[in-house]
């Protein structure tokens, strides 16, 4: 079983935020998976927020399994609901869904992506985030 982490979760593993400790505990030694686009999203986010931590972001990405984009995934992402979900977020949800029985949880701190994951029937987790 693997955890699919979107970029909002990956940032919390590189930059200390309020949910970082609970997320680290939740992840533990589990396999971390994401889509190839996470590399670009994470490095760009860290370069904006905390440029000195870019090497830490690169190390994190090196420890993960990154799933390549394919025609099938991009086609599936086009139909992820709701239609207001941003395109890159839809790609994350479609990629997480492609893991089927191997997915323990889609880990995200993006409320829209969490809702989309739930609509797609995926288990969703946001360790440390209040339900408010």
Task: Cite the ranges covered by each PLM segment.
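A general structural signal for well-ordered alpha-helical segments in protein cores
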Residues: 20, 39, 43, 54-57, ...
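Noncatalytic, solvent-exposed loop/strand surfaces
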Residues: 28, 58-61, 72, 114
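Acidic catalytic patch
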Residues: 62-95
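Acidic, PIN/NYN-like endoribonuclease modules and their adjacent C-terminal/linker elements
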Residues: 2, 35, 39, 67, ...
């Amino acid at each position: 079983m693997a955890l699919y982490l979107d970029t909002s979760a990956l940032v919390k593993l590189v930059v200390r935020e309020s949910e970082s400790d609970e997320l680290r505990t939740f992840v533990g030694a589990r396999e971390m998976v994401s889509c190839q686009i996470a590399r670009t999203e994470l490095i760009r986010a860290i370069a904006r927020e905390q440029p000195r931590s870019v090497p830490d972001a690169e190390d994190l990405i090196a420890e993960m399994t990154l799933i390549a984009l394919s025609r099938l995934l991009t086609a599936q992402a086009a139909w992820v609901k709701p239609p207001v979900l941003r395109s890159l977020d839809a790609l994350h949800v479609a990629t997480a869904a492609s893991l089927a029985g191997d997915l323990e949880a889609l880990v995200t701190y993006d409320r829209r992506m969490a809702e989309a994951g739930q609509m797609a029937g995926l288990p969703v987790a946001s360790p440390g985030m209040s339900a408010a």
